[in-house]
Amino acid sequence: GLVIGPYEMNAEAWGLDGIDWSFDNALLPPDTERLEPHLEKVAERIPVFGDAGIKRVVSGPITHTPDGNFLLGPAPGLKNFWMCCGASIGITQGAGAGKYLAQWMVYGQTEINVREMDARRFGDWAAGRYTLEKAIDDYEHMYQVHYPGEFREPGRTKRTTPIYETLKSKGAVFGEVFGWERAKWFDLNNEGEQYSFKRNNSFSAVAEECLAIREKAGLLDLSSFAKFDIEGPDAEAFLNRLCANRIPKKTGGISLVHLLTDLGGIECEG
């Protein structure tokens, strides 16, 4: 026998109005029409498939999150409610997910950084059209070639800063970080970003921008960065303990630091 499992480009969402708790591992009605383009290609590559025919079609739902990573850890806004779901390749990820979820529950942290899977990475903004479009797009591109720094269009412009339109008018090419549109570089030649595993057409433009800021001056839009006010008589000591660098003594001083976990791992940059 030959098993074929394509990720079709005209995917449809299921269960948008909720899923009955009685639904466990049941299957959905077969839909061969959506698979026809893929089946034709299989028959071209493996001619015997065209003569053998199809013995069985298995159709069932599969979960995809907006960024393709599963949801792990404490649920936002709830106490003692833990999540380990949303995995599109759960058989492969299951053992590791269970290990790090157990560490998180028992010790309050994991031995490796699991930020990319942290369920709290999605806020109230990640709902409706955003989640639907991004999840379908992730499914459709499951086994496509993914380039470094690649950002696709579905679900975009969900969160924009006050100067988004100004940056856009100057030729900014945007990426997405936690739903925010963040300028990556400025495409003055209107070429569009040409993704590559090597240096692409953004390299020289980014180099010029870095050189200009280093030797002259520049304005950075940090609106999408999280901001915290730490106050009190022990604020400095607390931050010096938390960060892998010393907090500036000078009022208004700025320093680049890495916030650490109790195990000495890097939680984030600040």
Where do the PLM segments sit?
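Extended catalytic-interface subdomain
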Residues: 1-19, 35-39
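Short, well-ordered strand-loop elements centered on a beta-strand within folded domains, enriched
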Residues: 2-6, 80-83, 192-199
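C-terminal catalytic lobe of FAD-dependent flavoproteins
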Residues: 21-22, 28-29, 35-159
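Solvent-exposed alpha-helices and their adjacent loops that cap or buttress functional pockets
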Residues: 1, 64, 74, 220, ...
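Structured core elements
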Residues: 3, 53, 71, 82-83, ...
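Flexible loop/turn segments at secondary-structure boundaries
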Residues: 10-13, 61-65, 90-92, 183-184, ...
